[in-house]
Structure formats: C-alpha cells, structure tokens
C-alpha cells in the first residue's frame, strides 16, 4: 500500500504530485467513511502533541477532531503552556517531545522552528502554519476544488491580494506541482519572491500547469474557475491604513466574480472580514467605508462561496496526513 510512513509534512515542495494525489484521495475516502459511519480507527494508542504559538480556531479543532476520530490521544500546548525558546531550547524541546509522542503538530511564527522540531524529534512533524508556509491549508483547498470541479488538471485559480503571504506562497507551490493554471492578482510591491516564482514555473512546466503573476485584473481573473483571497493583515498587526490603500483595488467583489466563469467558486482560508460583526470589520467600515475588507458580504454569502466546505475539509486532510504517516 502506498504510504508516507514516518514522513514530516513541512513544505509542499517536499512532496511529488503522486504524494499529494494520494493524500487527496485518502482525504476524500476518509470523509466518505466518516459520513457513512464506517470509519476505521488506525491510530489507536498513538499520542500526538500540537504546539500553537499563534491561536487558531480551525487548525486546532481540525487537529483534535482528526486525532479523536482515529482513536489517537492529543495534547494541546498553547503559547503560555510550554517553555520552548525561553527556559528550554527548541532542540531540547524537540528531543523531549520525540520521546513522549508519536507525532508533533506546530503552528507558529517561523518555518525554522517547525524544521528544527522535525530535525531533532525523530517523529513526524506537521506544519499547521508558519510565516512562509501553510501546507495543510492548501491540501484542504485542493480537496475542495476536486470535490466541486471533479478534477484539478487545467483548473484556473486566481488569488487576489497579497502575493507574498504564506497562503499565496503555498498555493503557488501546490498548484504548480498539481498542474493547475494559477494566477496571482496583486500590486507589484506584493508579488511573490522571484526565486519561488521561478521554482513554481519550473514545476508547472513538468506538471502541465501555468503560473501568472500580474497586477492586471483582466489577465488574472478572466475565465477563472476559482477565486481565492485571504486577510490583508495578519492577526495582531495594526497597519490597516497602508494595507487598505495598497490592496483595496484587489478586493473580491461582484465585479471580480463577474469576470470569472459563471460557475466559479469563491474560496477563503478564514477568518474573513466580510461584514460588520467583528471589532475590526466595524472599525474599518467606520474609518474607510469599505463593504467588507478583502471580500464583500455579497460574495462571501453567495451561492458561489464554498468557504465552509474548505473549513470542514481541514479535518479530513489533516486526518489523511496523520493516517498516512502514522497508521
């Protein structure tokens, strides 16, 4: 049986299209089994720890539910629940946790940290988000596209907003590996790193995909099957005025969706600022009069929106990673 036993999941560039296809197929099968009430627990007796330097709703819940569904035990360590980097080095922490646990999940500020955990723990380590990478999110994105469009090959997907962010970077990698026609619609100041773009174009050449980085709305959005965006400012940051002035022309709204295909789906990794029901959303409306920030309420709540399918699929894809590396 094809598996990824004992592999860490740190960066999509570590995996082939065959690896990712296997994980997506396994995710879909695990989802079907759960819905049918016939899921087989393959992780009984396994112990998993998840370390969160940055808070999250979806990522924490997805890891915990995935583990519980498969019979594993899980420990959560929040930003105030460990000594990592303060009273104990990251290397020593990795060694300790590797003796106690069968796998480690990490969500935090630095890619170097998750790689350190993988290098010194000697158990599989899963990247739940770092400053430059969000690979578990992209698995859920690709699974959702496959569910709604039937296939990934040739799908045209446009990311609108900050082309340098971890989600845009990871989409760039994943779409290049899997042969999608991926476009980033962003201001020139926020184009992705040129070296990463070069690598992605090389991968796309092998997979039959295509990579376009542009500040032209028509070039990016025309005939898109999928329109994707992310928040403009990371949680805890406050430079909204500069970001809004730079990115307001890249908001996903009715004009954008009308340029895409009629059956185009809208995706967002969440959380999203689309209404006035958050402190930040209300504050931005009062200051700038924006109807939503990165996406309007009209589009977020439209029939084209599959954002909650994506959120649910975080569970199934993370579960697939656990099963394939530990089962």
Curated annotation (Swiss-Prot):
- Check the record and name the PROSITE patterns matching this protein: CARBAMOYLTRANSFERASE
What domain of life does the native source organism fall in? Answer: Bacteria
Quote one Gene Ontology molecular function term: ornithine carbamoyltransferase activity
Protein name, entry field: Ornithine carbamoyltransferase, catabolic
Q: In which pathway does it act?
A: Amino-acid degradation; L-arginine degradation via ADI pathway; carbamoyl phosphate from L-arginine: step 2/2
Q: Can you tell me which residues bind carbamoyl phosphate?
A: 56-59, 83, 107, 134-137, 269-270, 314
Which keywords appear in this protein's UniProt record, sorted alphabetically?
Arginine metabolism, Cytoplasm, Transferase
Matching InterPro entries, A to Z?
Asp/Orn_carbamoyltranf_P-bd, Asp/Orn_carbamoylTrfase, Asp/Orn_carbamoylTrfase_sf, Asp_carbamoyltransf_Asp/Orn-bd, Orn/put_carbamltrans, OTCase_ArgI
| Subcellular location per the Swiss-Prot or TrEMBL entry | Cytoplasm
The biological processes this protein is annotated with in GO are: arginine biosynthetic process via ornithine; arginine catabolic process to ornithine; citrulline biosynthetic process
GO CC term (a single one): cytoplasm
Q: Which PANTHER family match?
A: ORNITHINE CARBAMOYLTRANSFERASE, CATABOLIC (PTHR45753:SF1), ORNITHINE CARBAMOYLTRANSFERASE, MITOCHONDRIAL (PTHR45753)
Cited Gene3D superfamilies: Aspartate/ornithine carbamoyltransferase
The entry's L-ornithine-binding residues are 166, 230, 234-235
Quote the function comment for this protein. Reversibly catalyzes the transfer of the carbamoyl group from carbamoyl phosphate (CP) to the N(epsilon) atom of ornithine (ORN) to produce L-citrulline.
NCBIfam families documented for this protein: orni_carb_tr, PRK00779.1, PRK04284.1
Q: Kindly state which reaction or reactions the protein catalyses.
A: carbamoyl phosphate + L-ornithine = L-citrulline + phosphate + H(+)
Task: State the similarity comment.
Answer: Belongs to the aspartate/ornithine carbamoyltransferase superfamily. OTCase family.
What's its EC?
2.1.3.3
């Amino acid at each position: 049986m094809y598996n990824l036993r004992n592999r860490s999941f740190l960066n999509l560039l570590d995996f082939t299209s065959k690896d990712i296809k296997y994980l997506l197929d396994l995710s879909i099968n695990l989802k079907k089994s759960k819905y049918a009430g016939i899921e087989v627990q393959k992780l009984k007796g396994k112990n998993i720890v998840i370390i969160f330097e940055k808070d999250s709703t979806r990522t924490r819940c997805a890891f915990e539910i995935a583990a519980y569904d498969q019979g594993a035990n899980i420990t959560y360590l929040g930003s105030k629940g460990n000594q990592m980097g303060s009273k104990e080095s990251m290397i020593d922490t990795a060694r300790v946790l590797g003796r106690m646990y069968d796998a480690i999940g990490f969500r935090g500020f630095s890619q170097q940290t998750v790689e350190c955990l993988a290098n010194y723990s000697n158990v599989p380590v899963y990247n739940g988000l770092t400053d430059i990478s969000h690979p578990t999110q992209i698995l859920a994105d690709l699974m959702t596209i496959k569910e709604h469009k039937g296939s990934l090959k040739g799908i045209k997907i446009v990311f609108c907003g900050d082309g340098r962010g971890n989600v845009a970077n990871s989409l760039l990698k994943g779409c290049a590996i899997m042969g999608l026609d991926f476009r980033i619609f962003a201001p020139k100041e926020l184009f992705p790193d040129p070296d990463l773009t070069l690598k992605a174009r090389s991968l796309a050449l092998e997979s039959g995909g295509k990579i376009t980085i542009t500040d032209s709305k028509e070039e990016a959005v025309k005939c898109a099957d999928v329109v994707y965006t992310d928040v403009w400012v990371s949680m805890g940051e406050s430079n909204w005025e500069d970001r809004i002035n730079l990115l307001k022309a890249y908001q996903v709204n009715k004009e954008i969706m009308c340029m895409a295909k009629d059956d185009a789906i809208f995706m967002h990794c969440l959380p999203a600022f689309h209404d006035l029901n958050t402190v930040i959303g209300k504050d931005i409306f009062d200051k700038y009069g924006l109807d939503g920030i990165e996406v309007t309420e009209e589009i977020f709540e439209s029939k084209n929106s599959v954002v909650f399918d994506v959120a649910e699929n975080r569970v199934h894809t993370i579960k697939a990673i656990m099963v394939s590396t530990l089962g």
